[in-house]
Amino acid sequence: MAISHGFNKTEAATSVTAPVTVNSGLQIVVGTAPVNMLDDPEAAVNTPMLVNTFKEAAAAVGYSDDFAKYTLCEAVSASFQVMGISPIVVVNVLDPANAKHITELSDKTVQVNDGIAEIDETGILLKKLVVKKEQTVLTADEDYSARFNDDGTVSIALVNGGKGDGATALTISGSILDPTKITAADIVGGVNAATGAETGLEVVRQVFPKLGMVPGILLAPRFSKDPMVCAALQAKCRKINGVFDAVCFVDIDSSASGARKYTDVANQKVKQGATSREAYGLWLYGKIGSAIYSGSSLAAAAAVYNDSLYNDTPNASPSNVSVPISSACLEDGTEVLMDQEQGNVLNEQGVATFIRSGDFVVWGNETCCYPKNTDPKDAFLCVRRFFNHSWTSFVLDNMSKLDKPMNKKRLQSIIDSENMKGSVYVSTEG
């Protein structure tokens, strides 16, 4: 038998669980995209799609600079091109299989120049496009080829020797996937009683089971000014998958029927029903060149960018974070010159905005429950988000321990893990 004489040691495996990286600001964006530009548009409807780059986003749901029509593209641009952060999850509700989302394109004559015809309509479904030379129907890929231009319009190139060869004009007809047909009900979504299929904001439930990621910020840019959508966003932030909590960034209406001046914002906030601790309300849009971005898209991207400066931890407010816009404006592009004093008036009503402080910055720490609810864990966005983040981290770190016998060793392991995370937070605080 071996004799242990002198100094000897044994090492036991560490019982402290390594913390799981949490994408605390994972944006889940529900809206519209030009999916007609895809080879299989139906595959990009009412399903959560994780995109890590601008190129991935364009491949997943299509892309257009017309943000008023295609709100997912606005969020994609705000995140990847404006603030330079990733990833985001996009959920498109514009459905080519839904007749309510279709506008029929009647016979339209387009001129042919050097064998090329340009269709200035956007949203065209190529599979339903009918192209005729006089009364002769042309066959795709035999008599002509069709491709999308960067702006979503379509170019038709006639094939030499095909039935359209030599034509000076073509007649086109078909179906257009029309984003103006989308309603608040499409964004809110629901569950089909017969099939169980989920649509709209109900798809948020699928993010964790499908992608293994926890929603952090829910968005429905521009649509969130609607009281029905605003209410649904706030409700969906609570008990996602029965466990997780999130926040939502909502636009306070600045259209012709909304708040056109800052003194009207408090009433508009109440009118929209933006009153919960989960909601962070933004009044005003931001303009970059000729492009107009909703406040919710810009502020959400700014918040996530700010998280990245603190090791993916939402312990700092997005307030006073720079956003590279050239002006703040109403939904229609009318410039609004907000100063700190006016911005503070909105903050006192639980609404954030954009002011110029050297650069343009997000301005406001308070959630929409303020001033009625002044509890710091509810009233301040960074505190609310940190509570959500801490709980999510705890759940993910300890999920493997569920249904295991609880003993002193396992309990101490949980305590040590949480203490370790707390020590990291303290050592990296900035």
State what each model feature region is.
Residues E118-I119, G123, I176-L201:
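Glycine/proline-rich low-complexity spacer/linker segments in large multi-domain proteins
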Residues N407-I415:
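Extended C-terminal subregions enriched in glycine
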Residues V424-G430:
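Short secondary-structure junctions
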Residues A2-V45, M49-K55, G62, A68-H101, ...:
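A glycine- and small-residue-enriched flexible loop/hinge signal that marks low-structured segments
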Residues T168-I176:
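Short, hydrophobic/aromatic-enriched beta-strand segments in well-ordered soluble domains
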Residues I85-D150, I176-P179:
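Extended beta-strand solenoid/passenger and fiber regions
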Residues E142-A167:
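A surface-exposed beta-strand-loop module
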